[in-house]
A protein has these predicted regions:
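Hydrophobic/aromatic interaction determinants used to assemble and anchor large protein complexes
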Residues: 9, 25, 140, 277, ...
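Nucleotide/pyrophosphate-binding catalytic subdomain
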Residues: 1-280, 329-349
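Intrinsically disordered, low-complexity cytosolic loops and termini enriched
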Residues: 1, 291-292, 302, 326
Length: 349
C-alpha cells in the first residue's frame, strides 16, 4: 500500500529549484554521500504495551514516510517494563509486541518489516583481544546481513533487546547495550569479527530517535515546561542536575545519557530526537479525525518528518508559547501532556 506524503516533498522541491553554483556543491556531495549509500535512522520504541493500536498504526505510517524520504529504519524494541510487570518470559513478551509492531509496519511500508531475534551476540570480555577499540561493549552485531539485507530492500528490521552468548543461549540484554552496539556497527566503528559486510560499509547512521511514552525532556525554566533543543556539550550537566533535584522520572536521565553515548560515536551533524508515540503519529491521526462538516483545518506538522528535512526542532526555543497553538504547530495540550519533542545534538557544528 502506498503512502500519501501530501506536501512533504515541497521543501526539497523548492531547494532543488534554487539557483546554485553547482560545480563545488556537487563535488562536496559526492564525497559525503557515496553511490548507493544507505542512510539510516536508529529508532528505539520503549514500552509498546502502553501504546494503543491506533497510535501504533500512526507510528508505522510515519516510519513508512521516512523510508519514502530515503531514510531507512532500524527499530529496537524495548519491552523491559512489560517483562518486569508480567509473569511470562521476556521472549514471549518480545514476540507478542514484535508481532504487533511488524503487522502495523506491514500495513504501510511497501517492503514491510522483519522481526529479527538472532542478529546480536554477547561477547566474552575476558577473551577480547587488546586490539579491539575501547568503544566495544558486551553486545555486538554478530550477523550484519540479517539487518543490511532488509535495509537494502527498504524493509524495516525490528530488533528485540536479546542476544546469543558463546554457547548459543539467548539472553535478555539492556537496551543501552543494544543501541550502542548498533550505533557502532552502522557507523563503521565496530570491530570486524568475520568477513566484512559491504552493505554495512555503505550505511550512514544519521539519526537517533527515541520513541518514549515520557516524550521529550521537561524543564521548569520555560513557560511551556519543555526542552525544545539541547546542546549536550553545554547543557548535559545542568539538565542532569535539574532532573535529579526536581524529582523527575529517572527514565529521562537514562534516555539522555544513552543519547549522549550514541551521539559521541557519530559525526557532529548527527542528531537525536526524543518524542512521544502520540507526537510521532500526529499527522496520521490528524488526517483520520478531520471534520466532515466542511470546515478546513491546517495539517499539523510531524516532528520526525520536519527533523529529517531540516535537522532542526519543529519549533524555535525562542518562540512564545502563545503562538504555538495559533500557528497550528502544536495542538492545544493539557498540562499533563505539555512535554513535547526534544532535539538533541552533541554540540554546535
Amino acid at each position: 500500500s502506498g503512502v500519501n506524503l501530501g506536501q512533504l516533498y515541497l521543501p526539497t522541491q523548492a531547494a532543488a529549484a534554487t539557483p546554485t553554483f553547482s560545480q563545488y556543491v556537487e563535488q562536496e556531495t559526492q564525497v559525503q554521500r557515496g553511490a548507493g549509500e544507505i542512510h539510516v535512522a536508529l529508532v528505539c520504541l520503549r514500552a509498546p504495551h502502553l501504546i494503543d493500536d491506533e497510535t501504533l498504526d500512526g507510528i508505522a505510517l510515519t516510519m513508512a514516510q521516512l523510508v519514502r524520504l530515503d531514510m531507512q529504519i532500524v527499530l529496537v524494541l524495548n519491552c523491559e517494563d512489560e517483562v518486569v510487570q508480567k509473569n511470562e518470559s521476556y521472549r514471549e513478551v518480545y514476540r507478542r509486541q514484535g508481532s504487533r509492531v511488524v503487522a502495523a509496519l506491514d500495513r504501510h511500508n511497501n517492503e514491510g518489516a522483519r522481526y529479527i531475534e538472532s542478529a546480536l551476540n554477547v561477547t566474552n570480555q575476558e577473551s577480547m583481544p587488546a586490539s579491539r577499540p575501547k568503544v566495544m561493549g558486551t553486545v555486538e552485531l554478530g550477523v550484519p546481513k540479517l539487518i543490511t539485507q532488509p535495509l537494502k530492500r527498504g524493509a524495516i528490521p525490528v530488533i528485540p533487546t536479546m542476544a546469543y552468548d558463546t554457547t548459543c543461549k539467548v539472553e535478555s540484554v539492556s537496551v543501552s547495550a543494544v543501541m550502542l552496539a548498533l550505533t557502532r556497527s552502522l557507523s563503521g566503528l565496530a570491530a570486524v569479527t568475520g568477513s566484512p559486510d559491504k552493505l554495512l560499509e555503505d550505511t550512514s547512521l544519521d539519526r537517533i530517535i527515541m520513541l518514549d511514552p515520557l516524550g521529550g525532556l521537561p524543564t521548569e525554566t520555560r513557560q511551556d515546561q519543555a526542552h525544545v533543543f539541547v546542546n549536550l556539550e553545554q547543557e548535559y550537566d545542568m539538565i542532569r542536575d535539574e532532573i535529579k533535584s526536581c524529582g523527575m522520572n529517572p527514565q529521562y536521565l537514562d534516555t539522555l545519557s544513552l543519547v549522549r553515548d550514541c551521539l559521541a560515536l557519530l559525526p557532529p551533524a548527527s542528531s537525536a530526537l526524543l518524542i512521544s508515540p502520540e507526537e510521532a503519529a500526529i499527522s496520521s491521526h490528524h488526517s483520520r479525525k478531520e471534520s466532515t462538516i466542511g470546515i478546513t483545518t491546517r495539517r499539523q506538522k510531524n516532528p520526525l518528518i520536519h527533523n529529517l528535512l531540516t535537522n532542526k526542532p519543529l519549533i524555535s526555543s525562542s518562540l512564545p508559547v502563545a503562538r504555538l497553538s495559533s500557528n497550528g504547530i502544536i495542538p492545544s495540550m493539557s498540562s499533563e501532556s505539555a512535554t513535547r519533542s526534544t532535539l538533541v545534538k552533541r554540540g554546535m557544528p
